[in-house]
A protein has these predicted regions:
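Conserved lysine of the Walker
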Residues: 85
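Conserved small/polar residues in nucleotide/adenosyl-binding loops
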Residues: 238-243
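N-terminal pre-Walker A segment at the start of P-loop NTPase domains
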Residues: 31-63
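Conserved nucleotide-sensing/catalytic segment adjacent to the nucleotide-binding pocket
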Residues: 118-165
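AAA+/P-loop NTPase substrate/partner-engagement loops
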Residues: 94-125, 129-133
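Pre-Walker A (Motif I) flank of P-loop NTPase domains
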Residues: 62-77, 139
């Protein structure tokens, strides 16, 4: 957030963890802190730290008869429209120096999955093959606007995610809905409940609602305007850095 009289200029993501970036941003004119966002940043910073440690331990593990390091638990944060979820994802994704990372809108990702499945339909288990391909391409997968409303997505999502977890992919997702609220009143929803349980088991679930809607604040105040998250960082996948 910034005021009309004080233009907030975000720090560069380079050489920052999410928390140190947030602290640097908070020291600049025009930045308005939010307790709920700060809590989310701390959770993202914890995951960032675990991913960096995992990378170092995995490098030591390769080629040695050591125990494989434990994969960090991913994160699912949800809240209403205007709570700054895209901003939070911008910070995490921008600060993470992994080469094999990807950020994608969830519905675009599912459309891609269905396309890949059609291309591999002659294989015995096309979904497993698709998941293996994704795991080779991506170690940290970030979803914007995770939501399930289509039965075709709902019926394959559980196995899709389970395969990705088994392949060692770490997921981070934003959503307007808690996992238990996904696929509401959908056809055969009872068969989707194990997918909800899987999300709750494999991901840390965090509610970022704070009662502050920055988009509404924009409409109600001439002195304050919202900085679109896209202005902070280009969302292009696969920036240079660690795999």
């Amino acid at each position: 957030m910034t005021t009309a009289n004080e233009r907030f200029i975000p720090p560069d993501f380079t050489n920052h963890s999410p928390l140190t970036w947030y602290q640097a941003a908070a020291s600049r004119p025009g930045f308005i802190q939010d307790a709920s966002q700060r809590k989310a940043i701390e959770c993202l910073d914890k995951l960032w730290t675990e991913l960096m440690m995992f990378k170092r331990k995995r490098n030591r593990f390769l080629g040695r008869s050591l125990r494989s390091p434990q994969l960090p638990k991913g994160l699912y944060f949800y809240g209403g429209v205007g709570r700054g979820k895209s901003f939070l994802m911008d910070v995490f994704y921008g600060c993470l120096p992994y080469r094999r990372k990807r950020r994608v809108h969830f519905h675009a990702f599912m459309a891609e999955i269905h396309r890949r499945l059609r291309e591999l339909k002659s294989e015995q288990d096309p979904l497993k093959s698709v998941d293996a391909e994704i795991a080779r391409e991506t170690r940290v997968l970030c979803f914007d606007e995770f939501h399930v409303s289509d039965i075709a997505d709902a019926m394959i999502l559980g196995r899709l995610l389970e395969n990705l977890f088994n392949e060692g992919v770490v997921l981070v997702a934003t959503s307007n809905y808690a996992p238990a609220e996904l696929y509401p009143q959908g056809q055969n929803r009872s068969s989707f409940l194990p997918t909800i349980a899987l999300l709750e088991e494999k991901l840390t679930i965090l509610n970022v609602d704070s009662g502050e809607d920055y988009r509404l604040r924009t409409l109600h105040s001439a002195d304050v305007f919202y900085i679109p998250a896209d202005n902070l960082k280009d969302r292009k996948s696969g920036s240079a850095g660690m795999p």
